[in-house]
């Protein structure tokens, strides 16, 4: 940022171990921001502003600077959510000096279901109408989909005093899940969101259930967008069905001249989808029905082999099951892969509700 840093906010956090939390901030944000570490301090720089965090007497002093009031609220929320996540249930006090009350999130968009259709036997697409699709055009592609209880007027969340999202409770409780904006139709002012259908005994899938039953006129909301697309001339993309909408969006947004290798694991050939792209795109489909976990040819083996054969300058993007993501992240670390040229995320965990 430059001289446009006109909106400022300060806060103080009292974690159980301030040194450890500062280390976690540096470790986590290196894949998402420009991280400048110094003795007892870190400066985070991103498109929405800067966060200057200093260690003072076992507390963290936070100074935010952003170009608009909206991005200031977003930055405050981002820092607050991460600090409580890093605390992992341990005591944490976080307060902000002269923070304004936010009754409704600045990046919350109420949308209306237009249609729902099956793309493949296990992937269902919901199209929603949005008054302003401008924020969704460009590099930020992930949103929280908010599904209100049926039969009640939606009560959308705001920001609490500590900067975290204040979710409605009781009868107004909302289901929230993270999804990818698969495509934006600017002229129609519509957004596409693909939902993986994966029924399993004893596993709740509220997001998938919503898509299965979605009706035109139904109201939901989106928080975002966030999660920028990788920018590189050469990309390695890897994931399963849960990551397929994101892989498809990355391929669609990639510029002509870029080279992309994609490894995608799906149930069988009926789950393969066309992936339009202006880039040079090579897709290797893996079929779960014909692969054996832990044997040569499995998803993890294919991804690690592809990483080992990366050309210099390749950005590696992987999204998959939690334990697989951890193994692939460890493999990248072992090979000394540049943290700024990778993004490895887990989208679901075996045996737990994720959709």
What is each PLM-predicted segment?
Residues 1-355:
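Extended, composition-driven regions rather than compact fold-specific motifs
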């Amino acid at each position: 940022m430059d001289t446009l840093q006109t909106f400022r906010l300060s806060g103080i956090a009292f974690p159980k171990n301030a040194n450890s939390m500062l280390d976690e901030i540096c470790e986590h944000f290196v894949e998402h921001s420009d991280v400048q570490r110094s003795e007892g301090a870190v400066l985070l720089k991103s498109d929405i502003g800067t966060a200057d965090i200093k260690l003072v007497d076992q507390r963290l002093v936070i100074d935010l600077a952003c170009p608009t009031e909206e991005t200031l609220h977003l930055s405050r929320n981002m820092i607050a959510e991460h600090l409580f996540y890093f605390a992992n249930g341990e005591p944490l006090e976080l307060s902000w000096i002269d923070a304004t009350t936010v009754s409704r999130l600045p990046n919350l968009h109420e949308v209306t279901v237009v249609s729902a259709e099956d793309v493949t036997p296990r992937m269902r697409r919901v199209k929603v109408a949005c008054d302003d699709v401008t924020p969704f055009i460009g590099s930020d592609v992930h949103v929280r989909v908010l599904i209100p209880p049926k039969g009640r007027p939606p009560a959308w969340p705001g920001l609490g005093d500590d900067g975290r999202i204040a979710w409605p409770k009781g009868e107004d409780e909302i289901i929230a899940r993270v999804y990818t904006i698969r495509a934006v139709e600017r002229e129609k002012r519509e957004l596409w969101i693909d939902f993986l259908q994966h029924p399993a005994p004893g596993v709740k899938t509220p997001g998938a259930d919503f898509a299965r039953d979605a009706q035109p006129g139904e109201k939901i909301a989106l928080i975002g967008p966030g999660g920028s697309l990788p920018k590189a001339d050469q990309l390695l993309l890897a994931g399963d069905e849960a990551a397929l909408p994101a892989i498809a969006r990355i391929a669609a947004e990639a510029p002509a001249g870029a080279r992309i290798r994609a490894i995608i694991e799906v149930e069988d050939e009926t789950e393969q989808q066309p992936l339009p792209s202006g880039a040079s795109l090579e897709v290797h489909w893996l079929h779960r029905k014909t692969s054996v976990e832990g044997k040569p040819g499995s998803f993890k083996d294919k991804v690690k082999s592809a990483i080992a054969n990366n050309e210099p300058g390749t950005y590696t993007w992987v999204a998959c099951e939690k334990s697989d993501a951890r193994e692939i992240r460890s493999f990248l670390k072992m090979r000394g892969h540049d943290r700024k040229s990778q993004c490895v995320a887990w989208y679901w965990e075996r045996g737990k509700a994720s959709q």
